[in-house]
Amino acid sequence: MALLLTLTSPDLEGTWDTRDKDGFKAQEGPPLAVPEFPVCGLYRIYGVCGSFSSFFIIRCSLCALETLKSPQHDPLEIPEQSLKLIPLVSGKRELTRGQKAGEKPLAAGPGEEELLRGSAPHAQDTQSEELPPSCTISGEKKPPAVSGEATGADAGRLCPPPRSRAPHKDRTLARSRPQTQGEDCSLPVGEVKIGKRSYSPAPGKQKKPNAMGLAPTSSPGAPNSARATHNPVPCGSGRGPCHLANLLSTLAQSNQNRDHKQGPPEVTCQIRKKTRTLYRSDQLEELEKIFQEDHYPDSDKRREIAQTVGVTPQRIMVKGAGSLVAGWSGGGPTIETLELQSERSAVAWVWFQNRRAKWRKMEKLNGKESKDNPAAPGPASSQCSSAAEILPAVPMEPKPDPFPQESPLDTFPEPPMLLTSDQTLAPTQPSEGAQRVVTPPLFSPPPVRRADLPFPLGPVHTPQLMPLLMDVAGSDSSHKDGPCGSWGTSITLPPPCSYLEELEPQDYQQSNQPGPFQFSQAPQPPLFQSPQPKLPYLPTFPFSMPSSLTLPPPEDSLFMFPCGPSGGTSQGYCPGASSGQILMQPPAGNIGTASWSDPCLPELPFPGPFCPQALGHPPGGDGYFPDLFPTPCPQALGRQPSSALSWMPEGARPGTGPLLSKAKEEPPAASLDQPSALEEARGDDKNSHVP
């Protein structure tokens, strides 16, 4: 059974389209007769779909009903008259534009309901773009064109046909979607069978079956037929021109959709390369000045900076441009002004961002340099891998008394804790008011338990020879510096460094004043009289007399001091008080000359890795302390007894009394005379020191 679709045009007469199983056909000549139906001049019938047993009228009503009568004919009595084959491939159009609310479609029979549901989307889609203004404008009033003639030209003028057909040969164009507000057109559907018609007219409207001739459809050359010459959506059959049209339509729509979707992203996703902003020297100076004031300017300040500096808008940045319009008043800036300010502020933001990165980099480099090179001008103790404290030089005020050149002295504590000394016995002083500098620590060799004996071990740069431990005739500490406080210091562990690396003082000043080296100067009283330690990282050195060395023994009640290399029991060890202080007494005369450039002490009372065996000392010698300082060559020294040990009371404080004033007057003391020497020294100490 062939399915006939008749589409008419309001402008042309004598043409109409039919569709059967072989495809779409355009026919010329008198249109096929359809059963009569109500129509008036403003009823624009733009589609008549029919078959042998039924037909559907697609119409749009704009005014009251008028009946159009036409002779009754069999719907498809002469279906083939002057056929012209036209290939029809097109897109979809909607059928519902210009509808009014309040119109209900005609009821269709049960057999046609299925056809209506299947073809309704296509019919709705094909209506809107093909309707002439008379159908698309709601409320438009047109004078009635026809009344009572069956095949009149005005009665046959209908709206332009849709561009789509039913998707299957058993389906046809169907009812419209549910009516929406403001729409006047509806797609009433009437089921017509031979000798019997059933339809439900709209409320308030009386309809009679009328027969009307099908109005001809438009041809491609007509003035208003551009919309009428259409290519309907192809059907769903798999054979013939309909199938080809379906394929072509699907491909065309998919290509259009793909082009439509892909087109805009290509335009919006264009990536613009960033250009560098070139600044003049005056702009850079201004920006640098502002950066020194504030490293992190906010958006308002960046905008002010951009206006002040006059940055040209050379690129647009996303960051920093969001809050540029905040706070503006008045009529409001134009789009060009906003873009200009945004660009300028963004450029200023980029400059500050780069400048902060450079600033952080410089801060890191400066921090590393300050760690590598400490800011203190004095020497550090060492750069070893221990966690020992870095000991910088401690400058001291110069003294008016002339000081000969001397080398740093080291201490020799107990073996487990090698203590460091960063202080010289008699600090060096240049000829004119320079400051004396504390020397780096010198470490003792690891011998057996012994006292803290500070000895000059480092070399000096002058080769002069000088007498050692000479007492000035009639010298008394009262005429030198007055009472001297103890060198109140604390003890720190030395870093495990090589001893030979620390023999040379890192910072010391040499004097150009020739003369004998004398331990005749006490430290500055104002600096060291306070009981609180001024140099808390130095071991204790209570130097009390011009010619004496006062040493604190370890807090060991069983402390034994080796008095000579011979190791004799009666002479080699002098048991001392647990809390007393050892005072070293110089020999009673010139015992020879020694060079400070020789770091070895041949007659020290203890063995060491760098000090050779005592030169020429008799095994059972008479002195507790042999000659302290060696000569450059093993020459015979005066065998004067070394300074005897004197013990100070526990509460005694080193002061200005002549501890060893009788040293020159005493003859060389034998080992049997040592107790009397100790008693004399103790008595003198009690008389001379103020507790």
From Swiss-Prot:
SUPFAM superfamilies to which the protein is assigned, alphabetical: Homeodomain-like (SSF46689)
UniProt-listed CDD domains: homeodomain
GO molecular function: DNA-binding transcription factor activity, RNA polymerase II-specific; RNA polymerase II cis-regulatory region sequence-specific DNA binding; sequence-specific DNA binding
Compartments it resides in: Nucleus
Listed Polar residues bias regions: 216-228, 420-432
One Gene Ontology CC term in the entry: chromatin
Gene Ontology BP, a term: oogenesis
SMART domains for the chain: HOX (SM00389)
InterPro entries assigned to the protein according to its UniProt record, in alphabetical order: HD, Homeodomain-like_sf, NOBOX
Lipoprotein among keywords: no
Ranges of compositional bias, category Basic and acidic residues: 94-103, 679-691
Highest taxon above the source species: Eukaryota
Keywords: Developmental protein, Differentiation, Disease variant, DNA-binding, Homeobox, Nucleus, Oogenesis, Premature ovarian failure, Transcription, Transcription regulation
Biased composition (Pro residues): 395-405
Clinical condition linked: Premature ovarian failure 5: An ovarian disorder defined as the cessation of ovarian function under the age of 40 years. It is characterized by oligomenorrhea or amenorrhea, in the presence of elevated levels of serum gonadotropins and low estradiol.
Segments for region (Disordered): 94-233, 366-385, 394-437, 635-691
DNA-binding region, residues: 272-363
Listed result of changing G91W: In POF5; uncertain significance; decreased transactivation activity; decreased nuclear location; intranuclear and cytosolic aggregates
Effect of R44L: No effect on transactivation activity; not statistically significant decrease of nuclear location
Full protein name: Homeobox protein NOBOX
Record function comment: Transcription factor which may play a role in oogenesis. Binds preferentially to the DNA sequences 5'-TAATTG-3', 5'-TAGTTG-3' and 5'-TAATTA-3'.
A Pfam family matched in the record: Homeodomain
